[in-house]
Curated annotation (Swiss-Prot):
Alphabetized CDD domains for the sequence: Ribosomal_L25_TL5_CTC
Chain segments carrying region Disordered: 171-207
Oligomeric form and interacting partners: Part of the 50S ribosomal subunit; part of the 5S rRNA/L5/L18/L25 subcomplex. Contacts the 5S rRNA. Binds to the 5S rRNA independently of L5 and L18.
Lineage start: Bacteria, Bacillati, Actinomycetota, Actinomycetes, Bifidobacteriales
A cellular component annotation (GO) from this entry: cytosolic large ribosomal subunit
A single GO BP: translation
Record's protein name: Large ribosomal subunit protein bL25
Key words, A-Z: Ribonucleoprotein, Ribosomal protein, RNA-binding, rRNA-binding
Record-linked InterPro entries: Rbsml_bL25/Gln-tRNA_synth_N, Ribosomal_bL25/Gln-tRNA_synth, Ribosomal_bL25_b-dom, Ribosomal_bL25_C, Ribosomal_bL25_long, Ribosomal_L25_dom, Ribosomal_uL5_bac-type
Pfam families, per database record: Ribosomal_L25p, Ribosomal_TL5_C
Amino acid sequence: MATTIKLEGEARSEFGKGVARRLRVANKIPATIYAGGEEPAFVTLPMRETTLALRHTNALFTIAFDGNTKMAVVKDVQKNPVKRIIEHIDFLEVKAGEKIDVEVPVFVEGTPKGAAVAFVDIQELKVRADVTNLPEKIVVSVEGLTDGTKVFAKDVVLPEGVELDIEDPEESVVTVEVPEDATESTTAPEAAAAPADAAAAPAADAK
């Protein structure tokens, strides 16, 4: 279920780098809400509340400004490359009951068998869902899986109401395998034991 966040903003009619700098000094973020073929809405949002809200992946925003209220999702976030502060946000207006495509981060849970380790092949999975049901993450269970097992996109268990939306459902999302260093560490003692046994043989013959 998507996290719904309400933000109180203000309409803005001034633009440009100078205006944007003044807004940031005043702890505000300039933003644009796009709505298909309609005219976009230009707003300013409180910096602290908005920055905290953006920690939620695929959150659904209700933005109130000057008597208007728009429901939207984040389209793009522009950050200062040095200070990493938010300089501008693009939102996409959505309607209740509308389905959209989103990229959702992939996480794994559980423990594979033996020395096997789970590797995430796709960091984000593209899915389609209602705007009120956008998942923040997709969890793939690797509990008890053995070395060489692959979890394909078509096999990922998605939340109810969420559909896979990628071109190749056979694409590997998670691979379970034993790392090379783990294999080497288990075979090294056996290799070391062979010379020791060979050295013991002449000693026994000398008796």
